[in-house]
Amino acid sequence: MISNSINVTPNKESKMYVVKRDGTKENVSFDKITSRISFLCEMEPKLNSDIVDPIEVAQKVVSGVFPGVKTTELDNLAAETAAYMSTRHPDYGILAARISVSNLHKQTSKSFVETVKKQYEFINPKSNLLAPLVSKELYEIVMKHGERLESVIDYYRDFDYDFFGFKTLERSYLHRINGKIVERPQHMLMRVSIGIHGEDLESAINTYKRLSEKLFTHATPTLFNAGTPSPQMSSCFLVQMKEDSIDGIYDTLKQCALISKSAGGIGIAVHKIRAAQSYIRGTNGTSNGLVPMLRVFNDTARYVDQGGGKRKGAFAVYLEPWHADVFEFIDLKKNTGKEEMRARDLFYALWVSDIFMERVEQNGDWALFCPNEAPGLAETHSEEHRALYLKYEATPDLPRRVIKAQELWFAIMESQVETGTPFILYKDACNAKSNQKNLGTISSSNLCTEIIQYTSPDEIAVCNLASIALPKFVRQKVGSTDPKEKEFDHQFLFEITKLITVNLNVIIDRNYYPVAEAKTSNLRHRPIGIGIQGLADVFIKMRMPFDSVAAAKLNVEIAETIYFAALTASHELAIRDGTYESFKGSPASKGILQFDMWNVTPSSRWNWAELKDNIVNKGGLRNSLLIAPMPTASTSQILGNNECFEPYTSNIYSRRVLAGEFTIVNKQLLEDLMELGIWSPEMKNQIVAARGSIQSIGGIPDDLKELYKTVWEIRQRTLIDMAADRGAFIDQSQSFNVFIAEPTFAKLTSMHFYSWKKGLKTGMYYLRTRPAADAIQFTVDPIVSQTPKPVENNINSTTPLKTPTKTPNSSNRISTSPTNNLTSPIRFNITQQQQQQQQQQQQQNNNEDDLANYDGMTCRREEGCLVCGS
């Protein structure tokens, strides 16, 4: 443990001793270890003394001690011991965090001023040159206002993080000098707040207070870089190829490298790059097409990581399905095939038009073109795009190939089943329902598919992000004495959303831009992106099953409140500072807001008529775009919430940190089962055996089974409906994952067409599937393990959940026979027994049962049909 849990008098004959921070040796004292743990248990809020046993924790710690263990190592051992016991009760997880935080506090200064000074005066030991970790501006502000800033920092709030949230901060977010952490979490939050607001001390302090209360969080690049010498605080960059030439391609490549170096994720539109075998006038040669070029981008993403090794570089590449290289494009991430035709470190997305979806549905023809020979397709959308496509399609000898649209469609499905990609976004919906439609045709989204912004060769779109911790807005119902009776505080959400809007707007002006084109775009259009995390936790707290009518209603109400608040704040900023440069001509300037573009009427909770009038006649807006629910992969782990707007994927899972793997139980479920008196190691093992589900476990009440459904037990139609419902109040888009346990082409087709017809902009971010056999199983009791069922794949505590890789087998591989084309339906090569197994599995998957058969396509109803599943 730490120094005050060690005997004061050294004893050379002692079998166990520790090495203190000053190098001296002292005996291990069981009593003092116990006393130290007891002290941390008694901190407010006190841990449940009937559950948490300091003596047992101390016994386990002592059993792992070795002679010469360092006090910091002893603390880490104690924290890990408590974390392993968190499946008994969440309070053990809190204890683990308290031990870890206490350990960090003993290794770092409690003075923010001293910490900043140390970072500013850091000298690189290898070069012997000054290498400040914080900016001169931050240093001068802290030196000038140090006493005031110190007075508002509440270090006690460091203890509010759970063990895994704290470990995520410790691993990547807190500043280090020579490998040793020098920041506390509260130091980081104050650094970020001052980095955003500078000399505006009151705004900085208010931001710090709200961040430390865990009401919201800024995005990872902001937490990384705010207050540093190069404060690149933006998350998302959207790049368009400068031009289809060597100069244009390599200029774009350099831009991507500079952005990635500064911790930005990138979306690249490559529609304008000529297809393979296209004529090159300058050399009288032919083009190699997209694949060799993208392999160069792939190597750049690998080489130039984000923030100096904190995160890998990440590029998403967007292509429209009329491009002649589209078949090679969608295969680039596959695990099999020629290596020179693969670029697996990039992410791939299709920018899909309505006319393509219609042709697939009708089993019609689809023409593929080279953009050099059929110009303008990437620069148009909706009816203009349709007219141009039809014109080119009817031009003799212009199409490179004419295929059946379903041939390309099923190649897309095959790639999605194997790799989880390509992402699917609907080009016409993205353009038709954008407040930037006055600027021109939007040609791509970003890395995570939630940012929809205009780009051009001279403008790289940028977006600054933050997410709201929704569980913090659930409170006890006013007037009720029942602590379980909850309500959602929309007024408080309104106030915090306004604060976030102001913060993100300030970042636009104070940000460091790695390339000039990004600064040009961001200052002209001033878009921001506000997201959410913990929606599933809100529903559980309010005792609303995720697929209930009440949850569907609250889902829309939350989205409406956030949109109204962000618009209100942006309008108030416009009154003070003026509208953004390109406001004139935008839909908002004409009184058309996002829900109008969806033909949705908002509720009467907020005064929309007054707000519209204010925007049109009394000041406009400061920001062109405002709402963009993102994945929140890392930041939701820091704050201890479920990701973004998604249901839980499992009620029990494994989380890996540097110290090892830990079993995690949904803490709210655990508390409910403990209250009923039915939580036990046997119950835990039953949940493990059921792969994180409680639906088949006897003794658990039906209302809890409804409340704790996992995403695999919720109909995919419900998730799409909820995405569309809140979509009317999302002026960018949302990182919408699709969950199908055992995907078939029929299920995927049904899901995609349902999403498209519901009007979603992002039809699919990742396809999340469930492996038939999971890679890692927990140990279960022999009685339970007689009929073992593996649990969910491990989730790394600092990275998003990865889609399990699936290699096509005989049940989902397309035949390579020349006769197997889309003039007649493609067949699975499956046996009758395999087909029966698939049908049985299909019936078992509740989340797909109403989407499994799509009869909108032309189909002969032949045995093994991919479309209808017959």
UniProtKB/Swiss-Prot annotation:
The enzyme's E.C. designation: 1.17.4.1
Protein known as: Ribonucleoside-diphosphate reductase large subunit
Function field: Provides the precursors necessary for DNA synthesis. Catalyzes the biosynthesis of deoxyribonucleotides from the corresponding ribonucleotides.
Biased composition range(s): Low complexity: 796-811, 832-844
Keyword Disulfide bond: yes
InterPro entries according to UniProt: ATP-cone_dom (IPR005144), NrdE_NrdA_C (IPR013346), RNR_lg_C (IPR000788), RNR_lsu_N (IPR013509), RNR_R1-su_N (IPR008926), Rrm1 (IPR039718)
Activity regulation statement: Under complex allosteric control mediated by deoxynucleoside triphosphates and ATP binding to separate specificity and activation sites on the large subunit. The type of nucleotide bound at the specificity site determines substrate preference. It seems probable that ATP makes the enzyme reduce CDP and UDP, dGTP favors ADP reduction and dTTP favors GDP reduction. Stimulated by ATP and inhibited by dATP binding to the activity site.
GO CC terms in record: ribonucleoside-diphosphate reductase complex
Record-annotated ATP-cone domain positions: 16-110
Marked site: Important for electron transfer: 765-766
Compartments where located: Cytoplasm
Subunit text: Heterodimer of a large and a small subunit.
Site features described as Interacts with thioredoxin/glutaredoxin, chain residue numbers: 865, 868
Sites where the protein binds ATP: 20-21, 26-32, 71, 75
GO molecular function: ATP binding; ribonucleoside-diphosphate reductase activity, thioredoxin disulfide as acceptor
Binding of GDP, residues: 235, 446, 450, 632-635
Record field: compositional bias (Polar residues): 812-831
